[in-house]
């Protein structure tokens, strides 16, 4: 019996090769991608790249997601294969094979599949490893080089991950054998789906959960809380999608059946009857396609937007080659650090900016009346942030005079309510808004709050000392900023950055010994070289992961579509043969097939685009934290991604529908 199950395991894989080809290809690809991610994560050459820590962190997180996604894809493909082999397994049982023999046969099939796919997958991964590393270097802005990245410890990690996945396959398939008797196995692949219960309640529940998920996605305004809300919204939308496909589609089909003028036409009757016959199975598959498609779109839109927006973020976060920023320190300390740096480095200055300003958070806002947090009050994330400049500083930055009087201010604001106001009250002090300004600090002074809150304002006051006195006792912070552009910013950039850090630390030690107040003084140094390196590492790594996750999600989408077409093609073949025998011609058969396939497989695409439309606001808030500050750019990226995905989806549809037509026409 041992030799018999060996022969059967091998012959079954050959005989069912049409089912196993896409399954094997998908498994090889996910193994290769997992190998590449593991190899890159362990790659010692990453330390040589700028922003190495950010790249390692992103790749490490990506590896976990890739491993989980790979397991889901393999399990899903296996479920379709085993479903279509139910009749075959039942026949073996009727012919005398016991369940333990069947289990032994399936175990050996899985071992053969595992050995072949792991061998080929690791081989493909190792083959493309150098090329993918060069691609990672390219997208993070480093010089490319095909450096050997082979790590011996990569293979055991990949083997352990997929040993767990294949072991789970064996358990799932074994459980399937245990719970079904031979007669059930022979009929399992052919039986229709039971009509669901409480369909109207499920439909309403689906609409409710999806609607609330959409509401969460649209109502969140804070980028920090958006991440938490995003996961809750995703769970609700996934649940709502499954409920609507499971119950909502059946309710709609039942309503169409009651509409006699529509239903009693050959093409419509056949399509609707086929869908109703197996709606529960269709519902799970279609909802899965919709969710996977949404994942592809959201992942690509987010990753591509982050990558496309990095130049805008760099210009905002690092407007100068070298900067020193101080809080609760006199401007002379900030200037001293920069002067010492320029003296010791020998850099020639092209442009220099020196600014002192205040910033504070708004606790409450009632129309144009604003309340600042008090000095000893426990802080929470503010509703809005204000940066306050004197009119002398404004003239220094813009070259323009405002000529403000004692009760006048000028304002640039992202606050929708304040944009239409002629006056503003800050802690009970009223000011007339003389002029609405453009963003006058962009490219000159970094605003660190743009990635935290979308509601921020720049206030210009006639005299900074008088204004500070008017808000005495509130939680305000004085900041000083000195930034310089040098003649040759690329010359010894790393050495200069280290020197600036060293001088800043030295000045901080002196200030710490002179000051005992709380909060204490703080000085930080930055260089565009460091910021750009960290940004390229994080953004490039994010895009890299986004591309490969999208490949995995797209692979899952294609697999689900293909296996649905193939499995339903075999199920429908006998029914279409009967219809042809009772008078349905080939043209009517093709029209019926086309209509059914169009309805079934473009419905998930419509849902995916709707999901993306409602998730767009939340995605824009989340990527804002990472530095995407240009909404127009993100919109263009989204349109391009949707267009490319639509074309890919149509291509998959065309190829799989041909397979379906070929099967039912046999």
List where the protein language model places each region.
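N-terminal Sec/SRP start-transfer signal
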Residues: 1-31, 195-200, 209, 244-293, ...
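Short cytosolic juxtamembrane segments of multi-pass membrane proteins
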Residues: 3-4, 179-193, 570-574, 661-666
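Hydrophobic alpha-helical transmembrane segments of multi-pass inner-membrane transport and secretion
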Residues: 18-45, 53-90, 110-124, 202-204, ...
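Short helix-loop junctions at transmembrane helix boundaries
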Residues: 39-53, 122-155, 211-228, 603-666
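Hydrophobic alpha-helical segments
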Residues: 112-256
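Alpha-helical transmembrane segments and their immediate juxtamembrane interface regions
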Residues: 154, 231, 235-254, 311-337, ...
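Basic-flanked hydrophobic alpha-helices used for secretion and membrane insertion
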Residues: 313-314, 320-325, 331-555
């Amino acid at each position: 019996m041992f030799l018999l199950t060996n022969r059967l395991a091998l012959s079954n894989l050959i005989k069912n090769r049409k089912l196993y080809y896409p399954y094997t290809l998908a498994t090889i690809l996910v193994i290769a991608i997992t190998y590449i991610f593991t190899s890159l994560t362990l790659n010692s050459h990453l330390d040589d790249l700028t922003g190495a820590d950010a790249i390692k962190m992103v790749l490490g997180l990506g590896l976990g997601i890739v491993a989980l996604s790979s397991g889901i894809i393999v399990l899903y493909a296996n479920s379709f294969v085993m479903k279509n082999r139910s009749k075959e397994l039942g026949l073996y049982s009727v012919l005398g094979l016991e369940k333990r023999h069947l289990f032994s046969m399936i175990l050996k099939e899985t071992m053969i599949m595992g050995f072949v796919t792991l061998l080929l997958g690791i081989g493909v991964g190792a083959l493309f490893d150098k090329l993918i590393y060069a691609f990672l270097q390219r997208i993070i802005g480093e010089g490319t080089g095909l450096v050997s990245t082979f790590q011996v410890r990569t293979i055991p990690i990949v083997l352990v991950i997929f040993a767990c996945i294949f072991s789970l396959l064996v358990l799932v398939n074994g459980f399937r054998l245990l719970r079904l008797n031979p007669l059930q196995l022979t009929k399992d692949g052919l039986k229709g789906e039971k009509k669901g219960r409480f369909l109207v309640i499920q439909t309403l529940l689906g609409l409710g959960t999806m609607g609330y998920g959409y509401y969460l996605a649209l109502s969140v305004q804070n980028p920090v809380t958006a991440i938490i809300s995003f996961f809750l919204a995703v769970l609700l939308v996934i649940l709502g999608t499954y409920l609507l496909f499971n119950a909502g589609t059946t309710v709609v089909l039942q309503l169409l059946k009651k509409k006699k003028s529509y239903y009693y036409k050959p093409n419509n009757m056949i399509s609707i009857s086929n869908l109703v016959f197996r709606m529960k199975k269709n519902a799970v598959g279609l909802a899965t396609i919709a969710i996977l498609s949404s994942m592809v779109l959201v992942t690509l839109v987010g990753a591509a937007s982050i990558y496309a927006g990095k130049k805008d973020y760099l210009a905002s976060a690092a407007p100068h080659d070298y900067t020193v920023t101080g809080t609760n320190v006199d401007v002379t300390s900030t200037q001293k650090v920069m002067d010492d740096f320029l003296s010791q480095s020998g850099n020639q200055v092209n442009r220099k900016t020196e600014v002192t300003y205040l910033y504070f958070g708004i606790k409450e806002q009632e129309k144009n009346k604003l309340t600042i947090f008090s000095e000893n009050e426990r802080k929470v994330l503010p509703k809005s942030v204000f940066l306050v400049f004197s009119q002398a500083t404004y003239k220094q930055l813009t070259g323009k005079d405002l000529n403000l009087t004692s009760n006048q201010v000028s304002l640039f604001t992202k606050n929708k309510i304040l944009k239409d106001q002629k006056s503003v009250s800050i802690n009970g002090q009223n000011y007339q808004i003389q002029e609405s300004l453009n963003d006058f600090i962009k490219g000159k002074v970094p605003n660190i709050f743009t990635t935290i809150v979308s509601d921020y304002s720049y206030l210009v006051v006639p005299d900074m000392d008088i204004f500070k006195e008017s808000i005495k006792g509130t939680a305000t912070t004085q900041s000083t900023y000195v930034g310089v552009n040098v003649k040759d910013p690329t010359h010894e950039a790393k050495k200069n950055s280290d020197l600036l850090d060293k001088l800043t630390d030295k000045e901080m030690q002196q200030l710490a010994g002179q000051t005992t107040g709380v909060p204490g003084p703080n000085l930080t140094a930055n260089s565009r070289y460091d910021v750009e390196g960290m940004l390229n590492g994080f953004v490039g790594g994010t895009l890299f992961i986004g591309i490969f996750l999208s490949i995995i999600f797209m692979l899952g989408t294609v697999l689900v579509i293909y296996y649905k077409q193939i499995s339903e093609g075999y199920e429908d073949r006998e029914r279409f043969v009967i219809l042809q025998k009772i008078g349905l011609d080939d043209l009517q058969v093709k029209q019926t097939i086309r209509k059914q396939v169009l309805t079934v497989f473009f419905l998930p695409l419509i849902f995916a685009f709707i999901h993306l439309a409602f998730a767009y606001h939340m995605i824009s808030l989340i990527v804002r934290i990472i530095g995407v500050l240009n909404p127009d750019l993100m919109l263009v990226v989204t349109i391009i991604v949707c267009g490319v995905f639509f074309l890919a989806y149509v291509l998959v549809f065309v190829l799989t529908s041909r397979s379906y037509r070929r099967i039912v026409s046999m």
